[in-house]
């Protein structure tokens, strides 16, 4: 098995070298392992894949796109300490392999009881791995990082849950505080911005939430409700308007949320959005519409930039790959090159490289 990883790492390193320039930023990306333990095959293979690259690609950061955990808290009992310990175990392994920071973003499975998310819980887990390079809003789960010529903005979605409410919300929203931070702080820059978030921005709830919200009780819900609610982003239109104003260098005001956003600088633009969540690959052009009636594969890219969705690092979770993979782990390595205005996702494992010129 070690030969498989070494051979794949050699191929990937040659591909990275072919597109890398002096100003390129390099980020290994993994997402959606959905593990119960650190020793399951999917995690062992992920760690082996990362280790095969650790001494060769010299990355600027490792991006963990979320949904590290399986259905802990619903499939089986798991305490908050156990959930936090498993998350720390994953990030500890990554940090031990690479000299660079690790940048985790939370998925809907990475919180207390899963699908419920408290930002202070995630902050306490994730802040130890960014090597003090991330700029956060208090103890937030969202943050930005400045690199030479590029800002990376890591969003939290889900952002918060009101567990004490009679009918708790499933937390699929950015929330007013995060949206104000996005407009006033994270996008207050005059440089290209790389967006990072677990849930793709095109993916949205297609039905009527009112009857389903009434079934929520504490941290538990029926399986059908979970399936239907995944992807419903209640305040996505406000986020869309913020991104459009940033891209078009215009003023944006939203009194209801408390936003007055000044025009962005002349060099400001969106590079692309990086996401996971779907378990298989996809690539979306700005404004692209696809199978809009299908919650699994359809939607509209409402962002004025391309969106890359990275497949699960565990091929057993990927419906397009399960059972016929040739490499037992899947990664993307993002190569962001400001001088050429390109972002290339080099594939480690089964799948194709993808490139966008912003």
What are these regions (language model features)?
Residues 51-61, 96, 151-153, 165-289:
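His/acidic metal-ligating clusters that form di-metal
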Residues 35, 69-70, 110, 201, ...:
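Short active-site segment of divalent metal-dependent hydrolases/proteases
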Residues 38-42, 73-84, 114-120, 164-170, ...:
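Short, flexible/disordered intra-domain loops and linkers
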Residues 27-29, 62-64, 104, 195, ...:
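Residue-level marker for buried hydrophobic side chains located in beta-strands
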Residues 32, 66-67, 107-108, 198, ...:
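Active-site glycine-centered loops adjacent to acidic/histidine catalytic or metal-binding residues
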Residues 338-358:
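Acidic, His/Gly-rich catalytic cores of divalent-metal-dependent hydrolytic chemistry
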Residues 1-81:
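N-terminal active-site segment of His-dependent metallophosphoesterases
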Residues 5-15, 74-187, 248, 266, ...:
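Extended active-site neighborhood of metal-dependent phosphoesterases/phosphodiesterases
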């Amino acid at each position: 098995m070690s030969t498989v990883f070494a051979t794949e790492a050699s191929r990937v390193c040659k591909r990275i070298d072919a597109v890398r320039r002096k100003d390129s930023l390099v980020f290994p990306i993994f997402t959606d392992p959905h593990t119960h333990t650190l020793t399951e095959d999917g995690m062992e293979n992920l760690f082996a894949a990362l280790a095969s690259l650790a001494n060769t690609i010299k990355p600027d950061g490792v991006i963990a796109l979320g949904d590290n955990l399986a259905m802990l808290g619903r499939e089986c009992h798991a305490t908050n300490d156990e959930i936090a310990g498993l998350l720390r175990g994953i990030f500890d392994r990554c940090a031990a392999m690479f000299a660079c920071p690790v940048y985790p973003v939370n998925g809907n499975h990475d919180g207390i009881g899963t699908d419920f998310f408290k930002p202070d819980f995630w902050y306490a887990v994730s802040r130890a791995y960014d090597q003090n390079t991330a700029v956060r809003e208090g103890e937030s789960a969202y943050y930005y990082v400045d690199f030479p010529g590029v800002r990376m903005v890591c969003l939290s979605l889900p952002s918060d849950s009101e567990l004490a409410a009679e009918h708790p919300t499933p937390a699929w929203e950015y929330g007013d505080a995060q949206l104000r931070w996005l407009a006033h702080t994270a996008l207050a820059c005059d440089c290209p911005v790389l967006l990072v978030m677990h849930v793709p921005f095109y993916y949205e709830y297609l039905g009527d939430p009112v009857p389903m919200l009434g079934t929520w009780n504490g941290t538990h819900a029926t399986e059908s409700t979970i399936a239907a609610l995944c992807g419903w982003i209640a305040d996505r239109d406000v986020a869309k308007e913020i991104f459009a104003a940033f891209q078009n260098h215009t003023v944006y005001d939203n009194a209801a949320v408390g936003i007055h956003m000044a025009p962005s600088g002349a060099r400001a633009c969106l590079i692309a959005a990086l996401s996971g969540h779907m378990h298989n690959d996809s690539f979306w052009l700005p404004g692209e519409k696809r199978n809009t009636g299908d919650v699994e594969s359809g939607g509209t890219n409402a962002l004025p930039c391309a969106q890359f969705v990275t497949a699960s690092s565990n091929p057993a979770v990927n419906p397009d790959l399960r059972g016929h993979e040739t490499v037992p782990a899947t990664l993307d390595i993002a190569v962001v090159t400001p001088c050429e205005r390109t972002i290339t996702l080099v594939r480690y494992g089964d799948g194709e490289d993808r490139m966008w010129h912003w």
